[in-house]
Design a protein with these regions (language model features):
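Single conserved hydrophobic/aromatic residue that forms the stacking wall/gate
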Residues: 1-6, 10
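Radical SAM enzyme [4Fe-4S]-AdoMet core and its adjacent flexible, acidic
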Residues: 47, 56-168, 172, 181-182, ...
Length: 303
């Protein structure tokens, strides 16, 4: 989107769509903001991991100030933007503090995505995964901050704990899927397995690949909407689907087996089940949120 020609693709060819871009914000400058201002259908989620020391420790020296500078520019041009926060065991206190939320609001953020740390990759550090107490806390804290009464003027969305609003996992083409830089059609940005590539297959063929069909046959992966993911909370599900469909790892640097990936999640899933079931049982609106009619007809709707 560095040129007016690229802007035309969004505005003229796809004026009936709204686009959301996740970015580290390092390429956002005044000229860029002027181009985006002409569009009206493009929003940005700027990656931020906490305050300066924590953020730059993960994303590089000086990035925190660049992000704040980009926010101030976008605010000046009246652009609609927010942040993308990955919460971990180490930064949980910071990214859920009043000071952090107030900082985002001060610099013009209208919303913020909160993503649970996923131990994806052969070298992923499982020690960064939140504790059970931390996950319970952020479940309650997000709802507190975005409440109409007593909350703050910013819309917060928790990718892992807001499953109740979308019927659990939306991946695998149910409502969403991911295409990586190589063109591989993956179920989710966190799930690097596929049996189709957009450079070799049509969009419909990508959606009909065996792995995606297995996803849709099995959704929701759990009737407890606080246990939505076939990797993090139901690791046996992803292993089974990858094995039965013959999907291959799409990690170009270091291919990871589903068994290795899900093995890192099994202790977490077992421990979280007790906490999640307790919270869900106390939920005032206990319901699936999504009905898989195919599995119900075939008599397999028991999770």
């Amino acid at each position: 989107l560095a040129s007016s020609a690229a802007s035309d693709v969004y505005k003229r060819q796809h004026s009936d769509c709204v686009f959301l871009c996740f970015t580290n914000a390092t390429l956002i400058d005044e000229e860029f903001c002027k181009e985006v201002q002409k569009l009206g259908n493009l929003s940005f989620s700027l990656s931020l991991e906490g305050f300066e020391e924590a953020n730059d420790g993960r994303r590089g020296q000086g990035i925190f100030q660049k992000v704040l500078g980009a926010m101030d520019l976008m605010k000046r041009y009246g652009l609609f933007f927010g942040t993308s926060v990955c919460y971990t065991r180490k930064n949980m206190d910071a990214v859920t503090s009043d000071e952090f939320f107030d900082l985002l609001i001060e610099h013009g953020c209208r919303y913020s995505w909160y993503f649970h740390y996923m131990p994806v990759g052969n070298e992923a550090d499982v020690e960064l995964m939140p504790t059970m107490e931390q996950r319970e806390y952020i479940y309650k804290r997000i709802r507190e901050v975005r409440a109409f009464e007593g909350g703050k003027p910013i819309m917060l969305m928790d990718f892992q704990n807001d499953g109740e609003f979308v019927g659990g996992c939306i991946a695998g083409g149910r409502n969403y899927f991911h295409i990586n830089a190589n063109g591989d059609a993956e179920p989710c940005v966190f799930i690097h397995y596929s049996g189709a590539n957009i450079r070799e297959n049509t969009l419909l063929e990508c959606l009909q690949q065996p792995l995606f069909m297995a996803y849709r046959d099995n959704q929701p992966f759990n009737d407890n909407m606080l246990r939505p993911c076939p990797m993090l909370e139901n690791p046996e599900k992803l292993q089974e689907m990858v094995r039965e469909t013959g999907a291959k790892s799409t990690d170009l640097q270091s291919p990871e087996s589903a068994e290795h990936l899900c093995g890192k999640c099994e202790p977490y899933a077992a421990e979280w089940k007790e906490h999640a079931d307790k919270i869900w049982a106390e939920h005032p609106f206990v319901k699936k949120g999504y009905k898989n009619y195919k599995s119900e007809i075939e008599g397999t709707d028991a999770k």
